[in-house]
Amino acid sequence: WCEFVSLPENSPEAMEAHTGVPAAEVRGAARLYANAANGAIYYGLGVTEHSQGSTMVMGMANLAMATGNLGRDGVGVNPLRGQNNVQGSCDMGSFPHELAGYRHVSDDIVRHQFENHWGVTIQSQPGLRIPNMFDAAIEGTFKAIFVQGEDIAQSDPNTIHVESALRSMELVIVQDLFLNETARFAHVFLPGTSFLEKDGTFTNAERRINRVRPAMRPRTGKHEWEVLCDVAKAMGGTMHYDHPSQIMDEIATLTPTFAGVSFERLDREGSMQWPVNDANPDGTPIMHIGKFVRGLGKFHITPYVATDEKASRRYPLLLTTGRILSQYNVGAQTRRTSNVAWHPEDVLEIHPADAEERGIRTGDDVTLASRVGTTTLRALVTDRMTQGVVYTTFHHPVSGANVVTTDNSDWATNCPEYKVTAVQVSPGKSAATAETNHPAHRLNALVRMANQIARQMAADNTGDPVAATALDRKSTRLNSSHT
């Protein structure tokens, strides 16, 4: 590794040509980090949403090991998760290649443990990642999808490709708080529950497991885990729980890092940081003290490999997308609040020189085009942007920012390369702009369907005709508001 970093092509001077960051600043930042008593690295999607995102994370881990910034308070390599419980979802095996506790499906011992407990057979080969699902759906080999709490039709890159995949499937089930863009393709829509109605745990980026308690019962009458149990039962499965604490007990039984976790302990003692087991009965505030699980740390070679997405004569600008403080992700929740006063629409930020060259002024409608799609946004001319780079957000479905982003992704994780898309910007609206608004008749049908499901769930759970009547009145208001 030392030989690798000493190569001339890996020097700050060589990298300056690729990044535009002066070599002197890179050296100064490196010395500041290396000489700090405690140096902590925090990173977000600006690092990972590149074709070489995983390589960059490995590079940061190399820096932390080389400078001794691991295994004690105030140091480490710390990902800033996009929202609460991303860590918890990963811990529970929300990957196509791992079971709970980050154990690979190819491990026969681990797989058989889960098979014996669940009474099912688990494939030893990894499943599909989301982009692979879309490709397989278009090819006709992927037939159905169950989407919970995610709007893939708005958030995933290359919207036209995603919509084609959704249309190709025989069954699309969407479970969410709101009728989002993906719900336009749903054969079945199931109402979801908010965090105020959930009973369970959230785990944050420091591996801290916190209890989450409901402030109210779900308006639909059932928790999401109960709905999943009903679906499993209808499909011939045996998934059954009477309380979410039983789910945590199963997690503790099957996952060594959670072996000592229970609702009873969390309610009595407060939050806990995994691993919590016989070796660490009170939890583990700091990991990697003195050594790693594998022993000594392993330095990874991290060669620079340029993205395949490059500016060209036809697409001379580079688009990067991101978020803004007042809106959250695809805006399914925040667009329904007064936050729209601060961010009523997605705009395209463009450098004054690039705007002048194209005859564009602030407030003008502009066409944003890439090799995969075209959309229309309003321009914001600002020297905040670097010349040659444009920026927009993706909070509003009408702007369809992901219509133009491509299928390029990280080499290891398939995380989309949202930060680099070659585009052209021209004045005026595009005739090819994708229409992403819900057709009124389709939206009304979905509203009626969702309310019918909610009424049935409420009746099944409580037998209360008053609740069903209240939902009928709400259904009328909802349909009127969307007509």
Language model features: what each stretch is:
Residues C90, F95, Q113, P244-S338:
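Long, low-complexity segments enriched in small/aliphatic residues
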